């Protein structure tokens, strides 16, 4: 019998990098510049409970938290009263330039605070070692609240179905620029923390761009990224109102898994991806019998599903039933003796439904006079971050007017039926209210998950220990919680009469009904531990079960190197696709005409005798002649994916398919006509050689279904004619197999630069290298352009063998196959640009129309939040040095 030594070594824990909008701490700077004060923040209780669980109680995971410090405030002492008062840190008045030593000191303070939190938890059954796991994102600049503008003033309203008046273009642009920098600062910080094999978990709408930024940063890594969206996700009709809608979706689909609070939110997201990104999706059921989607976009697959967040039920019950809470409960009951207590706690914003709640309560008192003097509504309204905004001020006035109206109509000198508290209340007071409540009333008009509802049910589940029964919950149908607490009394908050009837019914329930309701609701409450483990387990399964999990990212085009290579080259060849590359994709192909800016850039490129420019498009000869050849005769043109060519300054087209049998067109056209009749919005584009069936203007689901069916039918007979059936962007094209863009590229590169093309002559691969191009920029966006990129890569490989000693100073042959689209797109190109706008910026850079700074790709930030090596960064460093010198001088009494 063989025995093996038992492995007693500790199990290696999976590292998790948790990315949150803001660290769960409030940071203050005291009177001394080294006096840091750290305290816990309020709000996001469910998320912070998840962070606590991973940090203190999970033995499976090692957590690292990356988050913004939030607005750092300074404590100012009143000279007369000596009382400390908090004021926002404003760099205009008091520059806060932190030295590296100060940043390290504050980080250590945060770590110590986390450890002290752990020591306060005396009854944890599982103890995980506390690591130095807090990694602050530093964004110390003037007007610290600027980082919130785009998320709070543009994204948040749209996600909650609020269409704000259009912002001024320049203001929205500045907000967006800050939003991008905010996400890039996180990417930079994660780059310092990340190790191969880590799981990255990103939370909520401040960080929508981060998944794709991380994929670009860790290009060669099999990186696992999960994203959880805590807020609602709107229908496509609302989401598409966002001016940066595509960029936001592009950012998100860099994740491996995107998760929402409920199925309707995930369905809306998938719909937006289909309509705005031309994505496809397969629907199935997950282990919880909920809908999940495998979304295919840019050649990669993303899992999209829902998993409602929970609460820390164990901690809530522990905190809610203490002697201190017992005494507070007794005090509240004595204050409202013999009265039914309805409680509500909401943020005072336009979606929490405080106004709707007050109107419903007013209707209730009017409809049921027997309840007057018998019921009190205790409403706690927490101030929002933008408390001083005009909208919040108007809402506050409206709420106060309603409260005064109800109290004056139905109250008296001894009693007011509405007790409204516009403040943040301590946790012990909140838990006391949950315990004494006879009814919890939640009337939000839109939210992701209302944790007040979950906490109320949790507390009420244990009231039987006090010889009481759990009391009912009235919940808005527009709250994400209504999909979880299915046995709550669900109402439409806009129907005040229906809500009033529900209040009356809930208050009249007998003990048996309350007991049944309590047990049902308690079983429906998800715990934060289950939510955390399920989400992370799913990501781990994806990582271990999928051999093709690695999604290689195409790096952004290095434009500074491109510019230098362009300047050094003498024989430059430009190869451009048209639709989706030089112009955006539009519903009607006939509307995709060149812009004035494109004409200007092409004219400047053509004016340089060292340049040759070719447009290699799927468009027909007529279109290319009208919009390009007729206006810029210096352009070389290739139509119908290489079927026709027209040389520079030449009037005649050469048909490269002249000897090909075209009888196949009749049969293909008949099949396409059949599907055009069956698919409203589709149409056939009949070129001289190729036939293309377009379905961009159809209902996406129907168009995709019929496109798949059409392709299968065409493939059943096209092999007999040596034809290729290609999937384009919302189209199916049929053309001769031997003709493609790659053959045109091969002909143009293996050619003496600057000499006319002999279309009927074969390709010679024996030309001296110094007669061929030394700079080739090839741009395209779809499947057909991969033939160009593939051919360029093949030629480069050939040149490495034939001319190993003739590389340029950058170690290459000046070949730049560049795809236009997302970095996660499957391609053989060596680099990418995101969209036609970036294409024009890049070409503008080459002809001197655009500065290098304007055409910068991602923004690299320094520790103060400035663009690295920019003018503002240099000024910041100088100001920092001056400030440190001034401060040192004040300590020593010296003059600066």
From Swiss-Prot:
UniProt feature coiled coil, ranges: none
InterPro entries: Glyco_trans_20 (IPR001830), HAD-like_sf (IPR036412), HAD-SF_hydro_IIB (IPR006379), HAD_sf (IPR023214), Trehalose_PPase (IPR003337)
GO cellular component terms listed in the entry, alphabetical order: alpha,alpha-trehalose-phosphate synthase complex (UDP-forming); mitochondrion
Region (Glycosyltransferase): 1-554
Other known facts: Present with 22700 molecules/cell in log phase SD medium.
Names of required cofactors: Mg(2+)
EC number: 3.1.3.12
EC class of the enzyme, as a word: hydrolase
Alphabetical UniProt keywords: Cytoplasm, Hydrolase, Stress response
Record's subunit section: The trehalose synthase complex is composed of the two catalytic subunits TPS1 and TPS2, and at least one of the two regulatory subunits TPS3 or TSL1.
pH dependence: Optimum pH is 6.0.
Family in the record: In the N-terminal section; belongs to the glycosyltransferase 20 family. In the C-terminal section; belongs to the trehalose phosphatase family.
SUPFAM superfamilies: HAD-like, UDP-Glycosyltransferase/glycogen phosphorylase
Catalysis: reaction(s): alpha,alpha-trehalose 6-phosphate + H2O = alpha,alpha-trehalose + phosphate
Expression induction: By heat shock. Repressed by glucose.
Name this polypeptide is given: Trehalose-phosphatase
Protein location: Cytoplasm
Record entry for activity regulation: Inhibited by EDTA.
């Amino acid at each position: 019998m063989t025995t093996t030594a038992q492995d007693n070594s500790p199990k290696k824990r999976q590292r998790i990098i948790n990315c949150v909008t803001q660290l769960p701490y409030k940071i203050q700077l005291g009177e001394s510049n080294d006096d840091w004060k750290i305290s816990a923040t309020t709000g996001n209780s469910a998320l912070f409970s998840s962070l606590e669980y991973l940090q203190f109680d999970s033995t499976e995971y090692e957590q690292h938290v990356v988050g913004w410090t939030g607005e750092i405030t300074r404590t100012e002492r009143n000279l007369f009263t000596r009382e400390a008062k908090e004021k926002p840190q404003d760099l205009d008045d008091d520059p806060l330039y932190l030295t590296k030593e100060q940043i390290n000191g504050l980080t250590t303070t945060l770590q110590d605070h986390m450890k002290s939190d752990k020591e306060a938890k005396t009854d944890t059954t599982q103890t995980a070692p506390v690591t130095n796991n807090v990694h602050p994102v530093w964004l110390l600049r003037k007007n610290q609240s600027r980082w919130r503008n785009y998320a709070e003033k543009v994204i948040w309203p749209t996600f909650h179905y609020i269409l704000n008046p259009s912002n001024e273009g320049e203001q929205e642009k500045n907000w967006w620029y800050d939003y991008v920098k905010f996400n890039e600062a996180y990417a930079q910080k994660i780059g310092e923390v990340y190790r191969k094999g880590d799981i990255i978990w990103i939370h909520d709408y401040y960080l929508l761009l981060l998944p794709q930024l991380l994929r670009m940063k860790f290009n060669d890594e099999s990186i696992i990224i999960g994203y959880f969206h805590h807020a609602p996700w709107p229908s496509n009709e609302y989401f598409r109102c966002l001016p940066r809608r595509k960029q936001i979706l592009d950012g998100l689909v860099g994740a491996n898994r995107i998760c929402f609070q409920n199925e309707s939110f995930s369905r809306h997201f998938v719909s937006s991806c289909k309509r705005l990104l031309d994505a496809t999706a397969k629907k199935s059921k997950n282990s919880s019998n909920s809908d999940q989607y495998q979304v295919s976009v840019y050649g990669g697959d993303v899992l999209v599903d829902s998993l409602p967040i929970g609460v820390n039920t164990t901690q809530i019950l522990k905190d809610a039933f203490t002697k201190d809470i017992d005494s507070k409960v007794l005090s509240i009951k004595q204050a409202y003796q013999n009265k039914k207590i309805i409680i509500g706690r909401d943020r005072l914003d336009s979606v929490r439904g405080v106004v709707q709640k007050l109107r419903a309560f007013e209707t209730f008192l009017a409809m049921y006079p027997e309840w007057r003097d018998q019921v009190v509504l205790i409403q706690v309204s927490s101030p929002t971050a933008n408390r001083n905004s005009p909208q919040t001020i108007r809402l506050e006035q409206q709420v106060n007017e309603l409260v005064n109206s109800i109290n004056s109509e139905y109250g008296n000198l001894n009693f007011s039926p509405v007790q409204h508290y516009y403040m943040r209340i301590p946790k012990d007071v909140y838990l006391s209210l949950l315990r004494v409540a006879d009814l919890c009333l939640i009337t939000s008009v839109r939210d992701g998950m209302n944790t007040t509802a979950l906490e109320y049910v949790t507390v009420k589940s244990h009231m039987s220990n006090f010889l009481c029964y759990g009391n009912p919950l009235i919940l808005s149908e527009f709250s994400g919680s209504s999909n979880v607490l299915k046995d709550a009394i669900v109402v439409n908050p806009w129907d005040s009469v229906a809500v009033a009837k529900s209040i009356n019914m809930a208050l009249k329930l007998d003990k048996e009904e309350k007991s049944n309701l309590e047990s049902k609701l308690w079983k429906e409450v998800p715990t934060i531990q289950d939510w955390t483990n399920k989400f992370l387990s799913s990501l781990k399964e994806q990582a271990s079960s999928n051999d093709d999990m690695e999604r290689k990212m195409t790096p952004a085009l290095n434009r500074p190197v491109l510019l230098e290579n362009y300047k050094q080259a003498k024989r430059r060849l430009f190869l451009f696709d048209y639709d989706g590359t030089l112009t955006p994709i539009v519903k009607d192909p006939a509307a995709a005409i060149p812009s004035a800016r494109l004409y200007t850039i092409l004219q400047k490129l053509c004016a340089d005798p060292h340049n040759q420019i070719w447009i290699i498009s799927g468009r027909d000869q007529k279109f290319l002649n009208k919009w390009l050849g007729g206006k810029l005769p210096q352009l070389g043109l290739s139509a119908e994916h290489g079927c026709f060519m027209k040389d520079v300054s030449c009037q005649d087209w050469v048909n490269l398919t002249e000897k090909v049998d075209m009888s196949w067109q009749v049969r293909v056209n008949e099949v396409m006509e059949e599907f055009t009749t069956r698919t409203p919005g589709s149409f056939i584009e009949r070129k001289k050689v190729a036939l293309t069936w377009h379905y961009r203007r159809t209902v996406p689901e129907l168009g995709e279904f019929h496109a798949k069916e059409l392709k299968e039918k065409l493939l059943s007979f096209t092999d007999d004619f040596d034809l290729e059936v290609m999937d384009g962007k919302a189209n199916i094209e049929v053309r001769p197999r031997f003709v493609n863009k790659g053959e045109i590229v091969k002909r143009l590169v293996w050619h003496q630069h600057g000499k006319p093309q002999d279309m009927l002559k074969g390709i010679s691969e024996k030309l001296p290298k110094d007669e061929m191009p030394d700079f080739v920029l090839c741009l395209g966006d779809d499947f057909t352009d991969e033939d160009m990129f593939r051919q360029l890569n093949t030629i480069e490989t050939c040149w490495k063998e034939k001319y190993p000693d003739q590389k340029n100073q950058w170690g290459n042959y000046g070949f730049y196959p560049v795809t236009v689209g997302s970095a996660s797109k499957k391609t053989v190109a060596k680099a990418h640009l995101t969209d036609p706008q970036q294409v024009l910026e890049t070409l503008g850079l080459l002809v001197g129309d655009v500065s290098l700074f304007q055409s910068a790709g991602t923004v690299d930030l320094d520790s103060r939040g400035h663009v690295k090596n920019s003018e503002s960064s240099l000024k910041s460093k100088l100001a920092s040095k001056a400030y440190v010198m001034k401060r040192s001088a004040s300590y020593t009494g010296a003059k600066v």
